[in-house]
């Protein structure tokens, strides 16, 4: 009567024993970068990136609507989110090994014994039946092998979550930049069409004056050249607009994406104009690709614990408890109770160097993960430095281009007045038209590039994420 209790007690002891981890104590590698930003970036003022989500960064309502659509429908993002489910399932599978299972089992067996093998020199048919609960093989994790494998699976799962956050931030940036390029093409196209109408009108007047002998062939050819220049620029802008439109449709991923994209330029500015970069240490705690790299490093560290534990004895438990009988009708009769308890001790003696090779492999993979982590930090800091430099210089460039465009427009007005009053010839007026148009185009391009650079800075700093939006995707619908 006490033996079953002994088996149950042994099982309870196994559950309460804490595994001693063989994994090395984790220490975050020192960041291979400076402790502060250099130059003007250290004094840069603006919204704090750690409290700035993308909806606050994007001030244009149309762009916010398109980004929301992309986050709900983009296929590449959906694939990344499904990878989270796979990593979560893998972690749950590995975690299940830390607790014993329990199965209900029923077996029946009939066996014929030939006469020459039986004690009575005659053939016999024996039957046995059993029903009860069975404990599948359960490893008593004394040296932390299973715990280390579970920790590694957990870190891989957490890394996949950070990768999904990085993918979302990247999608916000890609949609924003595609929309900014599209909006810039619309602005250039509107200016080009307006310029083409004006030049065609001027060309018609020159043609009439040439027929009357009041304009030269040179005036005629110069005016025609400006018309053809505007036509070529119009076709170029039409091509760029359509390419940006197609890129947006792909990113949005919705069947009605084409109808959702506006056909005219939107408001300006579209983005928050000033962002403070924070400190380098904050960047390490915020950028999802850095956090994902650290989770992968932690997983490799846990793998070393599992590899070390393989050198030590492994204890497994199996058992069952139920009733047995030679007749099915006797399974629940008095005295039919049966049980078994089978502990197994496995001690590695010779494995051809397999365990040592596995340990060397785990250590090499950890060293590789350290290098990858440090490389990710260096890449992140390079991206931030580039984005800060681009944002600052493009802001000053945009200001200069605006002044240049305004100056060219004033010069065009003066040239037109001087031409109409007969002070200057037509060539001077045409040259002022050409300069004004090119400088207006340059200002539109510079303004677009500065907005795109702000998006680059937002992404490089780790972006801001709407924590209310789930990272889980439902396979039957949208994420």
UniProtKB/Swiss-Prot annotation:
UniProt GO MF annotations: efflux transmembrane transporter activity; transmembrane transporter activity
Keyword flag Lipoprotein: yes
UniProt cross-references to Pfam families, sorted A to Z: OEP (PF02321)
InterPro entries on file: OMF, OMP_efflux, RND_efflux_OM_lipoprot_NodT
Disulfide-linked positions: none
Main subcellular localisation: membrane
Region feature (Disordered): 102-121
Function summary: Channel-forming component of a multidrug resistance efflux pump.
UniProt protein name: Outer membrane protein OprJ
Lineage: Bacteria, Pseudomonadati, Pseudomonadota, Gammaproteobacteria, Pseudomonadales
Name of the gene this protein is made from: oprJ
């Amino acid at each position: 009567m006490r033996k079953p209790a002994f088996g149950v007690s042994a099982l309870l002891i196994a559950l309460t024993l804490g595994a001693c981890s063989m994994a090395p104590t984790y220490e975050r590698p020192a960041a291979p970068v400076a402790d502060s930003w250099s130059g003007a970036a250290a004094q840069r003022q603006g919204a704090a990136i750690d409290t700035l989500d993308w909806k606050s960064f994007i001030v244009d309502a149309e762009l916010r609507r398109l980004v929301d659509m992309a986050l709900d429908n983009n296929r590449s993002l959906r694939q990344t989110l499904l990878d989270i489910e796979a990593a979560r399932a893998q972690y749950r599978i590995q975690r299940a090994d830390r607790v014993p299972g329990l199965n209900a089992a029923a077996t029946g067996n009939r066996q014929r014994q030939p006469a020459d093998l039986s004690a009575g020199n005659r053939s016999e048919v024996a039957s046995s039946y059993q029903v009860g609960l069975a404990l599948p093989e359960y490893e008593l994790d004394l040296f932390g092998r299973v715990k280390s494998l579970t920790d590694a699976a957990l870190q891989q799962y957490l890394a996949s979550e950070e990768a999904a956050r990085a993918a979302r931030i990247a999608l916000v940036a890609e949609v924003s930049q595609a929309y900014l390029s599209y909006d810039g093409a619309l602005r250039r196209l509107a200016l080009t069409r307006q310029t083409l109408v004006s030049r065609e009108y001027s060309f018609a007047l020159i043609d009439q004056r040439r027929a009357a002998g009041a304009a030269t062939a040179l005036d005629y050819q110069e005016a025609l050249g400006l018309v053809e220049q505007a036509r070529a620029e119009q076709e170029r802008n039409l091509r760029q607009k359509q390419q940006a439109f197609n890129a947006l449709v792909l990113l949005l991923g919705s069947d009605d994406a084409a109808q959702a994209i506006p056909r005219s330029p939107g408001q300006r500015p579209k983005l928050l104009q000033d962002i403070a970069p924070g400190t380098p240490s904050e960047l390490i705690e915020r950028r999802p690709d850095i956090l994902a790299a650290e989770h992968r490093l932690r997983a490799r560290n846990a793998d070393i614990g599992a590899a070390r534990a393989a050198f030590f004895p492994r204890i497994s438990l199996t058992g069952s408890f139920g009733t047995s009988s030679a007749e099915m009708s006797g399974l629940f009769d008095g005295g039919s109770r049966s049980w078994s308890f089978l502990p197994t001790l496995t001690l590695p003696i010779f494995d051809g160097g397999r365990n040592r090779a596995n340990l060397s492999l785990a250590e090499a993979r950890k060293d590789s993960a350290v290098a990858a982590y440090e490389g990710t930090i260096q890449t992140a800091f390079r991206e931030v430095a580039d984005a800060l430099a681009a944002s600052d210089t493009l802001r000053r460039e945009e200001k200069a281009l605006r002044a240049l465009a305004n100056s060219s427009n004033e010069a065009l007005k003066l040239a037109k007045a001087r031409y109409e009053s007969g002070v200057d010839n037509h060539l001077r007026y045409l040259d002022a038209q050409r300069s004004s148009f090119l400088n207006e185009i340059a200002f539109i391009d510079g303004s677009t590039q500065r907005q795109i650079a702000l998006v680059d800075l937002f992404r490089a700093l780790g972006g801001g994420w709407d924590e209310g939006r789930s990272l889980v995707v439902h396979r039957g619908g949208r994420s």
